[in-house]
Amino acid sequence: MSRSALIENVTAMLADAGFSVSDRCATRPKSFDVAARRGSDVVLMKVLVNIDAFDAETGAEMRRLGTYLHATPLVVGLRTRDEDLDPGVVYFRHGVPVFNPDTAMELFVDGIPPLVYAAPGGLYVNIDGDVLADRREDERLSLGQLASELGVSRRTVSKYEDGMNASIEVAMRLEDLFGGELTAPVDVMDGAEDVRDTDPTPDDPEAAPEDVPVLSVLARVGFEVHPTVQAPFKAVGEAGAGHDRLLTGHSAFTEAAVKRARIMSSVGEVTHTRAVYVVDEAGRESVDDTAIVEREELANVDDSEDLRDLLADRGDLQEA
């Protein structure tokens, strides 16, 4: 299957699951393919046939954008260079959860979250330590007796009851002994932080020299500016403790600029984020819901409220 066909399938699946899905980010380079929202759940989705193509730079940008846009970065893919991705298993690449389309279908359409995740050494599951301790005590088994049944140490059983995750083989033996409901699903929409050590959000990249004049104005009027490298916009600006967010792009007002402005409008609608595109000269005030602002107008803005007023008449204001 081609990547384009796979993106279409995943996008259709998200729509069937009740998500509002943005236009595809048909620009290069691009850190994500679509943004999607269902209620309070927002995802930034990258779709790949071979997930080995997902590099560290893209992973870092998706994680940054997830933080700034209050979204979960996810990758859906079919395989690695060596093998297909197993259904029902969450993998990780550069801190981003990865799974195959069948797992995505179960999660988003059927409401069945995955139970298994891949980590160095094999496949693992979340063990509900409190339930395990209760079941062991109900069966009047000591830590040592259960350890003998499982072929592990007494200390390891104690760690399972304290919340340590177990290999899938141990989990299957536990369920043979005590029945089901010992395992807890992987919380994919929270970035699967329950099953992995969470690294801090990667640092922002340096702004490209040609972006500095526009981004410095946003910083001057009170926005915390986060430059991007691979997104269809140049930066995400935050003001008011992150409640006032702004996707920002700039270039000459060409057909390519209109295309980017449309994508920014669509992503902004899904993520409840305002979008502005800065140009030298323009014969219009908006492209869809992306405000078009001339550089001279932007230079005359005094503060974030002044900028908000300027944008209010140009496209619909997306509320965070």
From Swiss-Prot:
CDD domains in the record: HTH_XRE
TM helices/strands, residue ranges: none
Pfam families according to UniProt: HTH_3
InterPro entries from the UniProt entry: Arc_TR_HTH (IPR020886), Cro/C1-type_HTH (IPR001387), Lambda_DNA-bd_dom_sf (IPR010982)
UniProt key word Phosphoprotein: no
NCBIfam families listed in its UniProt record: PRK04140.1 (NF003162)
DNA-binding region: 143-162
UniProt keyword list: DNA-binding, Transcription, Transcription regulation
Domain HTH cro/C1-type: from-to ranges: 132-189
UniProt-listed PROSITE patterns: HTH_CROC1
GO molecular function: DNA binding; DNA-binding transcription factor activity
Name of the protein described by the UniProt record: Putative HTH-type transcriptional regulatory protein VNG_2112C
Claim: Cytoplasm is one of the keywords in the record: no
